[in-house]
């Protein structure tokens, strides 16, 4: 039995901190022989910026917004896979989700049976953390596997 995880899940949002997490996850994956999976969680805006006054309940508008969010997720994931490839690593799977990042990251980790989640931390201030919470804090609290939070 190995002490190393067989699957590592990298959670990314394309930020500078996520790039640091990507480097750590790719390095760990390569050195331990673990599969590397990447997840990006897009969000669905509650209002439309293209049609002021339109609500998210409009099925056509909701579909277009969802397609836009899914395209954003695919673009982000493609860029992350290329970054891992440039560092000599390989991505075993990509996962695009829409929703709350913390819940979706933990959900994907559970689906995969990931042995480690790697993500960056933005170091939000105490007021923002109190009002909105921190994705990394929430993932650490709710994940069913170890979590590596990479800071600058």
What residue spans do the PLM features occupy?
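Structural beta-alpha unit
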Residues: 1-4, 17, 31, 78-117
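Small/aliphatic-rich secondary-structure junction motif
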Residues: 2-59
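Short secondary-structure boundary segments
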Residues: 40, 121-122, 151-152
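Generic structural signal for helix capping and beta-alpha/helix-loop junctions
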Residues: 45-46, 101-104, 126
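Short, hinge-like loop/turn segments at secondary-structure boundaries
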Residues: 53-57, 111-113, 135-136
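A short acidic, glycine-rich active-site loop
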Residues: 58-75
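Glycine-rich, Arg-bearing micro-motifs that act as flexible, cationic patches
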Residues: 116-138
